[in-house]
Amino acid sequence: GFTNISLDLMYGLPTQTPDDLQRSVHEAFALAPEHISVYGLIVEEGTPFAAAEAAGRLALPSEDAAEEMYDWLMAELPARGYARYEISNFARAGYESRHNLGYWRNVPYLGVGAAAHGYVGGVRWGNESNTRAYIRTMRAGGSVRIPEDTQHTRDNAMEEYAFLALRTAEGVDEEDFARTFGVEIDDVYRAVIQRYIALGLLRR
């Protein structure tokens, strides 16, 4: 059978209560997965959920209830042996997602197929999302890549490196930052770093 199973769970869903979430998570624990991801529902603009919310037809949990769910998850998952290694990801020792860590560490990856996304040479891109158009373009020898980094600059690359790394428990690898960009992180972000350390929001 499978020896490495990951489950994705969501909280803050319509009509969901903290008790509902706890029951779902305890059912997940009963399956003994090696990895669990938890995501809070975000109602994106232009979606059916956004339209339903605007019309008063979406019974989302209150802000207090959603916060209670989050706090419970952050305490319960580590208590059950799942270490938090990224904002939304928890794993038993040695079972951290290589895909997730690669993304947060800015490792290049290829996107293959319609609507796939890739990151190569410091540039992010997505493939044509319409399958018929994708196949037609490929058969004609054309490019299906659509660049996503319309303003790809060194400054943007450094910012992206930093904020992706800050999503992880390991944080920013200062030596790797210096190797990648040829400059010490303090020479670029010293004032920002000092400000957030003083606020208790960042530590070294």
Question: In which residue ranges do the predicted regions lie?
Answer:
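Short, hydrophobic-biased segments on the C-terminal half of alpha helices
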Residues: V25, I193-Q194
